[in-house]
Amino acid sequence: SAAVSQLPGAVAVMDPFHVVHIAIDALEQCRQRVQQETLGHRGRKGDPLYAARKTLLTGTDILTDTSQARLDALFACPDHADVHATWRIYQDLLAAYRDRDPRRGKNTLHQLITTITRPDLPHTCIELARMGRTFKRRARDILAYFDHPHTSNGPTEAINGRLEHLRGIAQGFINHRNYRLRCLLHSGGFHHLLHP
């Protein structure tokens, strides 16, 4: 890519936001597939998988007793085995990133990637297999985060988001002064004048 050709010594790092998002997508797709296979329709208010969709995305360290009981009842059903396996991997991934010791977190995540990409593992859960292939392909980038902690393109994406928002609100302005005033108004440029 262009970045590699211009910065040959740079290390590619996949930040936790994007890695966890891959796991969340796999968990959601697995939940939706199992919902469709077991009940024959999309999630409805009284369906257990649909009712637990937000609880499934909550870390085990902050689950309430009620939420834990709901998950225990959900995973007691053998039809939900794929959801349980994907949820377990998701929780292990969160634990690896939340570990205060980067070396231990890296080892945990490396073992996780090795486990879900083992060839002898029966992949009945297609979402877990897909996530495993992605993690195996990007393993170096994922694990590099622990060697370069707090590496993220989040601040850059935040600035780009603000610029896109400003561009959107100022469309149609022909007068440059009005355009500039509108941008300052939305970006907080007048804050010190309005609230001295």
Feature names for model-found ranges:
Residues 16-40:
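Short alpha-helix plus adjacent loop in nuclease-associated cores
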